[in-house]
Design a protein with these regions (language model features):
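Short beta-strand segments at enzyme active-site cores
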Residues: 211-214
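C-terminal substrate-recognition/cap domain of FAD-linked oxidoreductases
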Residues: 6-199, 203, 207-208
Length: 217
């Protein structure tokens, strides 16, 4: 579940293992980003380590133990380690996510060209505030979508995790519903997008989170 994944990410962030990649995809994000096609179900956690002077097998095994402690399941063949070659070990859900991540900007532009409202935004908050912040942001976006006449999805992924907090990203993809049977023009789509953007920023402010996280400051 997503809740179990959040607990696992927090444990990893506070374990001192320092994964190079630790991304948690909610079920919708996993479906969109590709890991679901590789056999993963529900929320998906992708964890990776790298090092130039030490073996990684034991570190990765300990990380998987931590995930298991919080209810995570490791799909058959999901663990991949490549020692000594200098080449990355890829496959399964991780490779599916990577491919989707690289395609995403092109797909976004294509969707916008087809009249779909697409937005991605980020925040960061303390671990103790994550559950309430996540719920408030999702509710605010959903309400704004309903008010603006947008039908679509809201997904979330955790991209960065730290001992004291977490940085979730949210993606909105929605189709504007025509008003009075008239086609939805560009200005109308922009206005509806702006309503969603404003609602997300208001929720972030109300929950005392930040409008960005480290690398964008």
């Amino acid at each position: 579940t997503l809740d179990a994944g959040v607990r696992a990410v927090r444990a990893l962030a506070q374990s001192g293992l320092s994964p190079a990649n630790c991304r948690l995809l909610d079920p919708v994000e996993a479906l969109l980003a590709g890991p679901a096609a590789s056999g993963a179900t529900g929320a998906v956690l992708i964890v990776g380590f790298e090092g130039a002077d030490h073996a990684l097998g034991e570190v990765l095994s300990r990380a998987l133990e931590l995930c298991g402690d919080h209810g995570g399941d490791v799909a058959p063949g999901a663990m991949s380690v490549r020692e000594g070659s200098g080449e990355p070990a890829r496959g399964g859900a991780g490779e599916a996510w990577r491919s989707s991540f690289l395609r995403a900007p092109y797909q976004r532009d294509a969707l916008v060209g087809l009249g779909v409202v697409v937005e991605t935004f980020e925040t960061a908050c303390l671990w103790s505030r994550f559950e309430a912040t996540d719920a408030a942001i999702r509710a605010s976006i959903r309400n704004a979508m309903d008010q603006a006449g947008l039908e679509g999805i809201v997904s979330m992924r955790v991209t960065h995790a730290y001992p004291d907090g977490v940085a979730p990203y949210y993606t909105v993809m929605a189709r504007p519903t025509p008003a009075h049977g008239q086609p939805v023009g560009v200005n109308d789509r922009i206005a509806r997008w702006d309503a969603v953007k404003e609602a997300s920023m208001e929720a972030i402010s109300t929950e005392r989170a930040t409008a960005t996280h480290h690398h964008a400051v």
